[in-house]
A protein has these predicted regions:
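Conserved active-site tyrosine of GNAT-family acetyltransferases
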Residues: 24-28, 85, 112
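N-terminal beta-strand motif that seeds the catalytic metal site of vicinal oxygen chelate
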Residues: 1-22, 69-71, 118-122
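Vicinal oxygen chelate
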Residues: 11-19, 62-88, 103-108
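Amphipathic alpha-helical segments
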Residues: 20-35
Length: 122
């Protein structure tokens, strides 16, 4: 448990979940001069956006009642952090899952919103 609380966990990625990826990408391109880059991912597409040197970003199309930004916070051990969130009363929306560059899970609290937990491969 101490490993989970050894300092602040930084946000390393922001991802917009939306029902209209094309229009959302165009909105942010016009508003903030972001230049979304189309990345093929499995059977879908992902719009990667450059948010600066410290934070990655993207826009993903999915079924959602309303668009929402999902922050990814880096953790040391994905399984421990996910279980810690569960003990704090969060619902686990996505159990820890491995991807090409790390592991992620998504947790939700009725009072604190949703956050993705991220453990990069080293």
């Amino acid at each position: 448990m101490n490993a989970i609380r050894t300092g602040s966990r930084r946000v390393v990625h922001l991802e917009l979940h939306t029902g209209d990826q094309v229009r959302a990408g165009a909105f942010y391109a016009e508003l903030l001069q972001w230049r979304p880059e189309l990345v093929r991912a499995g059977s879908g597409c992902y719009l990667a956006v450059d948010l600066g040197p410290a934070v990655g970003g993207g826009i993903i199309e999915c079924q959602t009642r309303r668009p929402l930004w999902l922050p990814y916070a880096e953790v040391e051990r994905i399984d421990d952090a996910t279980e810690h969130a569960r003990r704090l009363g969060a619902a686990v929306l996505l159990e820890p899952r491995e991807g090409p560059s790390g592991w992620r899970s998504v947790v939700s609290s009725p009072v604190a919103g949703e956050v993705a937990l991220w453990q990069p491969k080293r």
